[in-house]
Amino acid sequence: MLTVDYDRLELRPGHLILDMGCGAGRHAFESFRNGARVIALDYSFDELAGCNDMFRAMRAAGEVGDDAEALPVRGDALHLPFADDTFDRIIASEVMEHLHDDARAISELARVLKPGGTIAVTVPAWLPEKVCWSLSAEYHAPLSEGGHVRIYTEAQLRERMEAAGLTPAGSHRAHALHSPYWWLRCAVGPTNGNHPLVKAYHKVLVWDMVEAPFVTRFTERMLNPVLGKSVVVYGTKPEPTTAGTTKGRRARVAA
């Protein structure tokens, strides 16, 4: 299940991409399949070990080309262990809502992105997230350890990116079918994954992800603008001019 649209990201073979807060690795794996050189960064040893196992399995199964590379790296989002202007592409998917100092984290991403490079930042969309917070205090911080600490509007996310020196461009919503699932989870208790209704809905989501039937794909596309669980904002880092100032590069991503 991908949140980022790789056509908009314009990832190319050989690009060096950072998946910051990679978690279980879904975007890192897709980037690896696309022939990129992938840095999968997370703070969790367990998540990184799982990613490393999958990278090896993908290589052994011949899913990736000889030039594709992938490396799990443990690191702190507020102090990225990379030099300035390192990455061609960056993905930060469902990370910022967990960080108290999100401004520092986005500034770090801007620092390590190459001038002219593209970044995709995804966070839970305002309406679905607001419903979750209203239904259950256990869904978010402080009752949920490591849980969500804020609710973003798209405008607020764009402001954070601009403040870090990035140029926000196109955006879209994703995963509308997942919003009711999380509302249901919050209604019965976020930790109650064995509730019959939760289990039944989860089976539908798994079926949709595996089979991708037309009816659910079409329905989700229609619902995404309103109920999409995640909002994705793409942006670029301005390129320096010969005069030493900067100029914005219009992002080559669809609006």
Feature-to-residue mapping (PLM):
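A C-terminal cap/extension of S-adenosyl-L-methionine-dependent methyltransferases
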Residues: 134-136, 178-255
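Short, solvent-exposed turn/loop segments enriched in Gly/Ser/Thr/Pro and often Arg
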Residues: 124-127, 174-179
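A structural motif corresponding to the C-terminal end of an alpha-helix
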Residues: 160-166, 237
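Conserved SAM-binding loop
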Residues: 2-133, 153-156, 233-235
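Residues that recognize and position ribonucleotide moieties
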Residues: 70, 150, 225
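Short, glycine-/aromatic-enriched active-site segment of Class I SAM-dependent methyltransferases
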Residues: 124-148, 158-160
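An amphipathic, basic-hydrophobic alpha-helix
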Residues: 3-8, 157, 211-220
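Conserved S-adenosyl-L-methionine
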Residues: 166-176
